[in-house]
């Protein structure tokens, strides 16, 4: 007796048509392409870039960003030159100072001021980057924090060389006189010493929000320059000289003037520079560590 299939027991199998075959092949191809994408995005296969990510394109980007900032260029290069030309409208070329003249003294002070403004601004720029979210984006990349800080320092030093050169180029116009070795040695001391204020700028940049950082830096730098004797020479042993000897720019300014031979060398200048360098580095590392922990 033959059995007839009941409607309730009927099992419908998926058709093995060409359409089904096409769907199957399409799924397999999409799976293979997805797996290739996963392989390309496999984070475990990423390796740290050389030098922690420090590269010429990164430095070039930072330099362009700094030079596009008109306020930075004015305060770092134009303003020191304007101050030097303004303060030397009276002819001081006949007034001796060490193995040079008073004009050379004032030139060194204004060149130092411009260099410190440049390096401080390079460090303090992190405040704007934090506010815009740029620094947080960078921390999601393989770029190491030390490479990021090194890039800031190198860019600050490169532009500070422009500030020093701009002021020194105006020296002969105002009849600045000193031996060739003093021109070179004083410029090198200014350039290397300005690295201290990269740490100061970083400390301020991580300490204050972007709206306040640059507003604080400008007046504060002017006050420190005044206490360091860069605008008006301080009388040795005076009350202002004793107060200024504990401020960050005092040691750098006197070290830059030392090649002129007007004053004997003092180790207090070196202690002053190293102490403030330690303070600025410690403060910058502390604030940067807390900022990094947010990500």
Q: Can you name each region flagged by the protein language model?
A:
Residues 86-90, 205-246:
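Transmembrane helix segments
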């Amino acid at each position: 007796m033959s059995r007839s299939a009941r409607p309730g027991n009927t099992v419908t199998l998926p058709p093995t048509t060409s359409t089904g075959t096409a769907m199957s092949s399409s799924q397999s191809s999409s799976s293979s392409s997805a797996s290739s994408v996963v392989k390309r995005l496999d984070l475990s296969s990423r390796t740290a870039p050389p030098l922690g990510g420090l590269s010429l394109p990164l430095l070039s980007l930072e330099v362009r960003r700094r030079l596009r900032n008109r306020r930075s260029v004015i305060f770092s290069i134009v303003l020191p030159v304007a101050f030097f030309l303004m303060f030397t409208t009276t002819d001081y070329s006949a007034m001796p100072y060490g193995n040079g003249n008073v004009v050379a003294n004032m030139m060194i002070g204004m060149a130092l001021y411009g260099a410190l403004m440049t390096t401080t601004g390079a460090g303090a720029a992190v405040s704007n980057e934090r506010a815009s979210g740029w620094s947080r984006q960078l921390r999601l990349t393989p770029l190491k924090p030390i490479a990021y800080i090194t890039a800031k320092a190198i860019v600050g030093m490169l532009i500070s060389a422009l500030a020093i050169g701009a002021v020194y180029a105006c020296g002969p116009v105002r009849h600045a006189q000193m031996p060739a070795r003093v021109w070179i040695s004083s410029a090198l001391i200014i350039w290397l010493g300005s690295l201290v204020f990269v740490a100061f700028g970083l400390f301020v940049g991580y300490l204050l929000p972007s709206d306040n950082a640059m507003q604080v830096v400008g007046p504060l730098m002017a006050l420190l320059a005044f206490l360091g004797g860069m605008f008006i020479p301080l009388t040795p042993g005076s009350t202002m000289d004793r107060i200024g000897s504990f401020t960050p720019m005092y040691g750098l300014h006197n070290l830059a003037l030392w090649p002129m031979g007007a004053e004997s060398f003092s180790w207090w200048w070196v202690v002053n520079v190293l102490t403030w360098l330690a303070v600025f580095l410690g403060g910058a590392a502390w604030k940067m560590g807390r900022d990094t922990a947010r990500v």
